[in-house]
Regions:
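Beta-rich, aromatic/charged-enriched effector core domains that present basic-aromatic interfaces
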Residues: 83-164
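Surface-exposed, flexible loop/turn segments at secondary-structure boundaries
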Residues: 13, 36, 76, 106, ...
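Catalytic cores of large soluble enzymes that bind and process phosphate-bearing ligands
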Residues: 46-49, 53, 78, 104, ...
Length: 164
């Protein structure tokens, strides 16, 4: 099944399980977008550093024989909008399945949830694998408890991960 996988600019993890195997059926995508540079004022050096890291990571992915589509800020196909870029690639490459890693930013999380609901193809989310905890660990830990003391959560995490 032809799959499109989105990599966001803060998910540059070459050790992610996605990259353990190469497949002709998987296409990765990354986008430099005005949507991300303009929603909050950023120093130009921060934006340049962010895009430089993304470009370097994209070269690593290609060097490891993964298919990747990368839209630079001035790419003629870049719609400057995440949903529009994804929709373009889904149509252009006859994608049957879409996957993405859970974003750390609420705004992007909501945008991707809405986008996936609008799709006529299947979709799936993955953990970013760069944190000790998963998205719902804190909520699950405190479920049914009357006291919400972070120290107890941290102690539990240290035991689980054998730290200290």
């Amino acid at each position: 099944m032809k799959t499109l996988r989105l990599i966001l600019g803060d998910q540059l993890n070459s050790k992610h399980s996605w990259f353990k195997e190469q497949s002709e059926e998987v296409i990765y995508c990354m986008f430099e977008m005005r949507q991300e540079t303009d929603h909050v004022t950023h120093h130009i050096q921060k934006i340049i550093g962010f895009f430089a890291a993304m470009r370097d990571f994209s070269e690593q992915i290609k060097a490891n024989n993964h298919k990747l589509i990368y839209f630079t800020l001035d790419d003629k196909n870049n719609k400057q909008d995440l949903a529009e870029n994804l929709q373009f690639l889904i149509k252009e490459h006859k994608i049957k399945h879409f996957e993405y890693q859970l974003p750390d930013e609420y705004r992007l999380d909501q945008q991707l949830i809405k986008f996936c609901k609008s799709l006529e193809i299947s979709s799936k989310t993955y953990d970013t694998e760069h944190f000790y905890t998963k998205r719902n660990d804190l909520k699950d830990f405190f479920k049914g408890k009357k006291q919400f003391l972070m120290e107890s959560f941290y102690r539990d995490m240290r035991k689980k991960h054998d730290i200290l």
